[in-house]
A protein has these predicted regions:
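Extracytoplasmic catalytic/substrate-binding loops of multi-pass membrane glycan-assembly enzymes
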Residues: 37-49, 60-73
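Membrane-water interface of alpha-helical transmembrane segments
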Residues: 10-20, 115-125
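Short, Lys/Arg-rich, polar N-terminal cytosolic tail immediately upstream
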Residues: 1-13
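Membrane-interacting alpha-helical segments
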Residues: 4, 52-55, 74-77, 81
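Transmembrane-helix motifs of polytopic, lipid-linked glycan transferases
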Residues: 123-138
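Transmembrane signal-anchor helices characteristic of membrane glycosylation enzymes that use polyprenol
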Residues: 16-44, 56-59
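Extracytoplasmic catalytic-loop and juxtamembrane helix elements of membrane-embedded
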Residues: 42-53, 88-98
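Interfacial juxtamembrane loops and adjacent helix segments
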Residues: 61-124
């Protein structure tokens, strides 16, 4: 038997009527509902402008205390909406933490639209629990 045949025999087919799929869809649906109806928490306010700055400038100084992957994913759909924001004087030194000042200015600049931007960012991050749930099942 060839190596390809052995690999093919080891793969499990995906059954869409499996109860795990129902649980995953329900889980993601509830997360969409929660992401749509709750306000941003303390950290999210700074995460989103930091993620936008990563995409726009390739600069990782804002919120540089955690890995940037989630901020990258969250900021991607917000960049499509092209929020207007002045980025002047956001970084002041290697030991500074300007993300909180930037977050306040970002919310002031985007106004009531900022809640929609946070929703878009949260919806983009739903890929993480969906993938995690899928691979936990596998």
């Amino acid at each position: 038997m060839s190596v390809g045949g052995e690999f093919k025999a080891m793969r499990k087919p995906i059954h869409w009527n499996h109860p795990v799929w129902v649980i995953l869809v329900l889980h993601v649906s509830l997360l969409v509902l929660i992401a749509s109806r709750t306000t941003p928490n303390v950290d999210e306010v700074a995460h989103l402008p930091a993620g936008i700055s990563y995409w726009k400038f390739g600069d990782f100084q804002l919120y540089s205390v955690n890995p940037p992957l989630v901020r990258f994913v969250a900021a991607a759909p917000v960049l499509v909406a092209e929020p207007e924001f002045d980025w002047e004087a956001t970084i002041s030194g290697p030991e500074s933490r300007p993300e909180w000042e930037v977050a306040q200015r970002y919310i002031a600049a985007t106004g009531s639209r900022s809640l929609w931007y946070f929703r878009f960012a949260r919806w983009a991050c739903l890929v993480f629990p969906a993938i995690g749930g899928f691979f936990s099942w596998k």
